[in-house]
Regions:
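Second-shell loop/turn segments in exported
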Residues: 27-32, 80-86, 154-163
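A short, solvent-exposed beta-edge/loop patch
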Residues: 118-179
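Short, solvent-exposed recognition patches
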Residues: 42, 46-136, 140-141
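C-terminal motif of bacterial Sec signal peptides marking the signal peptidase cleavage site
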Residues: 15-17
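Repetitive helical segments and hydrophobic/amphipathic motifs
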Residues: 11-12
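N-terminal "mature-domain start" segment
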Residues: 19-76, 167-179
Length: 179
């Protein structure tokens, strides 16, 4: 009886010790549009540890100051891909950039170059289905970015296992700008 009680208490202590830790800090999850007066550059993002893999030609993306594809490691040293779009202001990001971003986000994303409004970098916005798929599913593609946030004058497109994780990844990178 004592042995069962001791084992139960040890098990309970382990569960309580591990149960409070989450993989992300959900208390810092940002709204989709926030920090309206913030003005950021790609250098602000690279100063957080964001690594640029590719800078896109934005000559056909009206009023954009630049778009960069790259990755960033969060506090748990886990790397995620992002696309960062910078505009002169949040107002211009909303007016000129929102439709282009919403077109490539989520399940209904436009991922064919022939159908996309802004073709530059479209190959980096696609993912192939996992290796466990077979048949026609094995060759299907899906959107890499499941969510985005508009943080000041920047638009941050984020990956994640689902919408909640993607939003948290957006928030984690954006919140790191203020550290």
């Amino acid at each position: 009886m004592k042995r069962t009680l001791i084992i139960s208490l040890i098990f309970l202590a382990i569960v309580l010790a591990c149960g409070g830790e989450s993989s992300s800090n959900s208390d810092n999850t940002l709204e989709k549009i926030t920090n309206e007066s913030g003005i950021y550059t790609v250098e602000d993002f690279t100063n957080t540890g964001f690594k640029v893999n590719k800078e896109y030609d934005v000559s056909e993306l009206e009023d954009s100051l630049g778009v960069w594809f790259g990755f960033w490691k969060n506090d748990f040293n886990k790397s995620f891909d992002y696309e960062i779009r910078i505009y002169p202001s949040q107002e211009l990001a909303l007016d000129k950039g929102l439709s282009f971003v919403e077109e490539v986000i989520g399940e209904d994303a436009i991922l064919k170059k022939s159908l996309s409004s802004w073709k530059e970098g479209i190959q980096h916005r696609r993912l192939r289905r996992g290796n466990s798929m077979s048949g026609s599913e094995a060759n299907s593609i899906r959107a890499k970015y499941l969510d985005y946030i508009i943080y000041g004058n920047s638009m941050v497109l984020c990956t994640g296992l689902d919408l909640t994780v993607a939003r948290q990844n957006c928030s984690d990178l954006s919140n790191s700008l203020n550290k």
